Swiss-Prot record:
Modified residues (Phosphoserine): S65, S117, S148, S175, S188, S194, S210, S211, S220
Species of provenance: Homo sapiens (Human)
Cytoplasmic side stretches: 24-358
PROSITE patterns xref list: CBM20
Name the UniProt record assigns to this protein: Starch-binding domain-containing protein 1
Tissue-level expression: Expressed at high level in skeletal and cardiac muscles. Moderately expressed in liver and placenta. No expression is found in pancreas, kidney or lung. Present in skeletal muscle, heart and placenta (at protein level).
The gene coding this protein: STBD1
Compositional bias segments (type: Basic and acidic residues): 30-42, 106-115
């Protein structure tokens, strides 16, 4: 058993050594890798060194030529670093001279931060030869010539932004608001004056022989006889009242209110038993206070099936009206009779009627 264990240990050691050798590669590969590294280091030093691989050295032993390849690139890198420092110093001198020549454009440097970085030269890139340095200098001068119009554009844009900010600030000031309000008031006053002139001309066009109280159907009911002056006064008051409701806040143009324009309270009352809770009784008529047959005035339920509501109507006026049944916001039933007529007179009154019966 001891011999078996020793054989297994020896075999395992050999297998492990072979596995490690396969992972690291053969001894010939190291020479190739060293040559590849030397070839990569050669361009960094500038020009290739002649005879670098002509010394006859094999891949197993690099020899003294490999040491020369290692030391020379370091020397070239130092020289390149010296060249890089020179390019940095020259760039700083050019920037300082440009700022001294153009001191007024220092403000425009902030606007260059918003320009894409691809439009500015990268002067900190390492130069590998004097030819590349001369090219970088030409590119720097060309890009600086391009930067000058970009700086002017940023300066103009800054002026536009400042002008817009000044206008916004002026709009927020209370003095500008006062000026705007005064201008609006003057325009509204001029519009009111022009409308007053038009209304005065329309009043002059009203025929003097028209009577505003003659309302009736088939001569069955006649309005009280009015003289000419009363007819004109009533006509003008009715016209002014109608226009005053259409135009908001313009009732001040009525200088004198005639005595016939006073109002009386009329209480409409009817008995009707509705079938549902959503139904109610309303009144409508040809006068604007009654909805002009387009809308209705709801009546309030009292008790025992009675509905009533008080409405103000102009005195000495004949109106045509009727009760209606309303359900869900719409008229579902009208009185089964002809239209009713009412003479308002000069005193308050109560109009009690039965549904569908005159």
């Amino acid at each position: 058993m001891g011999a078996v264990w020793s054989a297994l240990l020896v075999g395992g050691g050999l297998a492990g050594a072979l596995f490690v050798w396969l992972l690291r590669g053969g001894p010939g590969d190291t020479g190739k890798d060293g040559d590849a590294e030397q070839e990569k280091d050669a361009p960094l030093g500038g020009a290739a060194i002649p005879g670098g691989h002509q010394s006859g050295s094999s891949g197993l032993s690099p020899g003294p030529s490999g040491q020369e390849l290692v030391t020379k690139p370091e020397h070239l890198q130092e020289s390149n670093g010296h060249l890089i420092s020179k390019t940095k110093d020259l760039g700083k001198l050019q920037a300082a001279s440009w700022r001294l020549q153009n001191p007024s454009r220092e403000v425009c440097d902030n606007s260059r931060e918003h320009v894409p970085s691809g439009q500015f030269p990268d002067t900190e890139a390492p130069a590998t030869s004097e030819t590349s340095n001369s090219r970088s200098y030409s590119e720097v001068s060309r890009n600086e010539s391009l930067e000058s119009p970009m700086g002017e554009w940023g300066f103009q844009k800054g002026q536009e932004i400042s002008a817009k900010a000044a206008t916004c600030f002026a709009e927020k000031l209370p003095s500008s608001n006062l000026l705007k309000n005064r201008a609006k008031e003057e325009m509204s006053l001029s519009d009111l004056n022009s409308q007053d002139r038009v209304d005065h001309e329309e009043w002059e066009m009203v025929p003097r022989h028209s009577s505003w109280g003659d309302v009736g159907v088939g001569g069955s009911l006649k309005a009280p006889v009015l003289n000419l002056n009363q007819g004109m006064d009533n006509g003008r008051s009715t016209l002014v009242e109608a226009r005053g409701q259409q135009v908001h806040g313009k009732m001040e143009r009525v200088a004198v209110m005639p005595a016939g324009s006073q109002q009386v309270s009329v209480r409409f009352q009817v008995h009707y038993v509705t079938s549902t809770d959503v139904q109610f009784i309303a009144v409508t008529g040809d006068h604007e206070c009654l909805g002009r047959w387009n809308t209705y005035i709801p009546l309030h339920y009292n008790k025992d099936g009675f509905w009533s509501h008080s409405i103000f109507l102009p005195a000495d006026t004949v109106v045509e009206w009727k009760f209606v049944l309303v359900e869900n916001g719409g008229v579902t039933r009208w009185e089964e009779c002809s239209n009713r007529f009412l003479e308002t007179g000069h005193e308050d009154k109560v109009v009690h009627a039965w549904w569908g019966i005159h």
